[in-house]
Amino acid sequence: DVDKCETCPDMAWKINAVGSANVASACQRNGIRLIAISTDYVFSGDSERPYTEFDTPTGGINVYGQSKWAGEQAVRTHCPNHIIVRISWLYGPGGPSFVHTMLKLADGSRNVLKVVNDQHGNPTSTFAVVRALRELLIRPELVGTFHLTCEGEATWYDFARRIFELAGKSQKVVPCSSAEYVTPARRPANSRLEKKMLALYNLPPMPHWEREFEEFMVKNENIQLC
């Protein structure tokens, strides 16, 4: 919970940084390969291009990103046999997610929904991440940091329109700026992640977000009832 981390920073650091260090140390002591899940929020979001695994994060612009970056560093320090996976704009059947939120709002009393149109990222399904993780797990020689987000990019406004279109909703959506939608934690303007490591190790590419989302909605047609 990005906003909860901003309002409860001590807890965020204990879980994301100290907790990661403890898990990494335990894995190293027991000879266990560690798979750690991280986030696009370790980057500041001010780049004009997608971030690669070879870009050095600055720690992000919110407590969540800063504490997750500290957790990444702890994993690298305490457990050399590791894979760090960065994901972003994640959705799945279990929720909560942006998809669930939009569909719930569409079933409410709002005539018009304002959705942020100046934040860019890669909408990514949990199913796509799991498939990619499986490919990493069967390659025991792999170590390092991997970006696992779907190909293609969108803004939250773009994503919202596609959600309503595929769900058969007639909800009116209008774009707004981040300044108009204030949250406890700032969000990066650029959350796009490039997958150079997948290509480097000849691993299957991630699917395009639109195709993946279409398949997700077909398989989870009742998600709007969640």
Residue ranges and their predicted role:
Residues 1-15:
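NAD(P)H-binding glycine-rich loop region in Rossmannoid oxidoreductase-like domains
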Residues 11, 19-22, 33, 65, ...:
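Conserved cofactor-binding/catalytic machinery of classical short-chain dehydrogenase/reductase
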Residues 18-61:
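Conserved Rossmann-fold NAD(P)-dependent oxidoreductase catalytic core, especially the SDR/UDP-sugar
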Residues 26-30, 78, 109, 167:
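Helix C-cap/helix->beta junction micro-motif
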Residues 54, 59-83:
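Active-site Tyr-X1-5-Lys
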Residues 73-121, 127-134:
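NAD(P)-dependent short-chain dehydrogenase/reductase
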Residues 132-133, 139-185, 189, 217, ...:
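Mid/C-terminal beta-alpha module of Rossmann-like enzyme folds, strongest
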Residues 154, 189-226:
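C-terminal amphipathic/interface module of NAD(P)-dependent oxidoreductases
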